[in-house]
């Protein structure tokens, strides 16, 4: 399958966030079927993360999970492994606690196709208050 976007997520003991993260990807107006999600787990020790990743891998053909044997302690290790596997036209590095508005990927995809480079911004949410990044 040729995906428009590959989303690479390095995880470690992040089970509490994974459903919400994947829900925000599934709701993308670009179309979930055009998005590849690659989770690379950095040897999590909690069963919640491992169970969810195995479930996602079975349930969705465009979601894969890779499990590292040893904890590297560095998200770049998982991201680099994900890059080796990514088949999308473009790549997004995401964190397990990220959440995206419904048109985020569509806007980014359209903009990158209109320009040579795309640099995006983000907002941080703490205690239900949005803190804009400057």
Task: List where the protein language model places each region.
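Nucleotide-sugar donor-binding/catalytic module of glycosyltransferases
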Residues: 1-134
């Amino acid at each position: 399958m040729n995906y428009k976007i590959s989303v690479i997520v390095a995880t470690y003991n992040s089970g509490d966030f994974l459903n919400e993260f994947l829900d925000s990807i599934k709701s993308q107006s670009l179309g979930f079927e055009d998005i590849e999600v690659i989770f690379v787990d950095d040897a999590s020790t909690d069963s919640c993360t491992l169970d969810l990743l195995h479930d996602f891998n079975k349930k969705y053909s465009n979601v894969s999970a890779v499990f590292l044997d040893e904890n590297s302690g560095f998200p770049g290790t998982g991201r680099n492994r994900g890059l080796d596997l990514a088949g999308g036209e473009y790549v997004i590095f995401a964190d397990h606690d990220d959440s995206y508005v419904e048109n985020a990927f569509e806007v980014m995809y359209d903009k990158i196709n209109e320009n040579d480079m795309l640099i995006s911004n983000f907002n941080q949410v703490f205690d239900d208050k949005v803190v804009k990044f400057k």
